[in-house]
Amino acid sequence: MSTVTKTITVLPGDHVGTEICNEAIKVLEAIEQATPYQKIHFEFKHHLIGGAAIDSTGVPLPDDSLAAAKSSDAVLLGAVGGPKWGTGAVRPEQGLLKIRKELNLYANLRPCNFASDALLELSPLKSEIVKGTNFTVVRELVGGIYFGERQEQEESADGESAWDTEKYSVAEVTRITRMAAFMALQHNPPLPIWSLDKANVLASSRLWRKTVDKVMKEEFPQLTIQHQLIDSAAMILVQSPTKLNGIVITSNMFGDIISDEASVIPGSLGLLPSASLASLPDTNSAFGLYEPCHGSAPDLPENKVNPIATILSVAMMLRLSLDSLKEAEALEEAVRQVLDSGVRTADLRGTNSTKEVGEAVVAAVTKILKDAA
């Protein structure tokens, strides 16, 4: 069996970014050593992004970071930003927007579920309401109002107004609909799809709904699609989140808001992974960028951040970009075992450190893979 080499560009970013990336790398190295399913080698290339890049180079995304990302199989990102860099002309978050655009990462995937039923009690909602919640938000990431034409207040003739534009094309909506459909078809039976929009008010949402319907009818007639207005969906998410189980597809801004709302259901942002893909994972080798849903947590002392979201992002990477499904399943099971055993950071009412949780996952995934040999 020949060794397959997979190149991963690591962009730790700012504050806790370095710590969580370190734990994720340890997990990948453990999988490389222990997996009986293939001979695989992970090659890591470390580069700057965000505030760390601004401090070192003056820009939030240096050219060498972008070039490294483009030439790798996948990108692992820590977190960017912090009060140190403020809201001036050059901001850490610009690096994130630029890399998404430059790598054409058009689909953001954010699962909302419980890594372990032992965590149900941590949800701010009642256990009986959230038990069984399991959906993935598929958010369009490079179109819509965040990338539309705009005018700042200072640029207006009277200095009294500002505007942004929400624009979507049929091609953009078709592409994200296919991604959602593909994610639904990865399951047996296929998952239902919910499309969220504001078609009762917005022209862009009417195009969105019409295009989603056309693509689903012509290309995926075996799948079920239901439309929900975004404000109604926001209510359902709190009242009865399991109603949205399946795949939830929506635009850039609506997806930004609804996925953040969904992120509080499992009780901690420290649990939630995300993937941003540039192509369909139809051969389990889509190019993607993987990062936790939480931010850089500048106020958190060292060795306190929860590494689980980043480790579960690695599980998504193994499944969608690195063609390592068995290893992804083993890693998710390892996380479940560690959380069930009570090894947890403070955000999950635990007493363990970042490194202790990371080491526990390394030990668990190593055992699972070796037992499978």
Swiss-Prot record:
- GO molecular function: any one? NAD binding
- In which residues is substrate bound? 100, 110, 139, 231
Instruction: Spell out the reaction equation it catalyses.
Output: (2R,3S)-3-isopropylmalate + NAD(+) = 4-methyl-2-oxopentanoate + CO2 + NADH
Q: What are the protein's UniProt keywords?
A: Amino-acid biosynthesis, Branched-chain amino acid biosynthesis, Cytoplasm, Leucine biosynthesis, Magnesium, Manganese, Metal-binding, NAD, Oxidoreductase
Q: Which GO terms describe its biological process?
A: L-leucine biosynthetic process
Q: Which PANTHER family match?
A: 3-ISOPROPYLMALATE DEHYDROGENASE (PTHR42979:SF1)
Q: How does it assemble?
A: Homodimer.
This chain's protein is named 3-isopropylmalate dehydrogenase
What organism, scientifically named, is this protein from? Scheffersomyces stipitis (strain ATCC 58785 / CBS 6054 / NBRC 10063 / NRRL Y-11545)
